[in-house]
Amino acid sequence: MTIETLTSLKLSFFILGFILFFFLETKYSNRAWKTRRYKRLLFHSTIALFNTVIMRLPVLFILMPMLLLVAENQFGLLYLVADYNIIKFIISFLILDIAMYWWHRFNHKNQFLWRFHFVHHVDTHMDVGTSLRFHIGELILSTLYKSVIILFFGITLAEFLFYEIILVLSVQFHHSNIRINDRFDASLSKFIVTPKYHTNHHTRVRKSREANYASIFTIWDKIF
């Protein structure tokens, strides 16, 4: 499977996920809409389009070379403990999720990083469009961070893109304005990030905002 095929696969899941969660939050809204939805959709889509165009450069010249280096040389810490198999695949997924937990946390604790991440937190009325609202500076820096993780641990293209697909769907889900039964949400949030779980992170109250950093698995918030 080529890089182009895997990248197209990620884009397909991104589009399908966005359409799905947009439909679900339209039909089963949890909170009343404070602004016209088409304005929010247009604004966030414009940000996403701009970011997508600009991000082609760091992805092409930084991220992809790291992934190719790992693939060609089987370079990285995980190759010392496991060959390419299901065990390495699972470990790589968990490492990436832990890495994203710490990246998110760094964005809140470091004043320089917070200047970029604050753009995402300006939107306190979350919907699936909020998952598109990121400063280009944060995306570039996160690409550099991911590249270091990939090279150090020896994460392959397939492992990375699989995680990215699940991450995109998770971010779309837990930013969406979907009404979920409280009991079911409480059970689900013991394992993965849900809209209600992540809503607390988007309040203007700093104490609430400095928690719930997880991207997929909520266990990292409990451990760290």
Could you describe each region identified by the protein language model?
Residues 23-42:
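Membrane-interface helix-loop junction between the first two transmembrane segments
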Residues 67-80:
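Membrane-interface helix termini and inter-helical loops of multi-pass transporters
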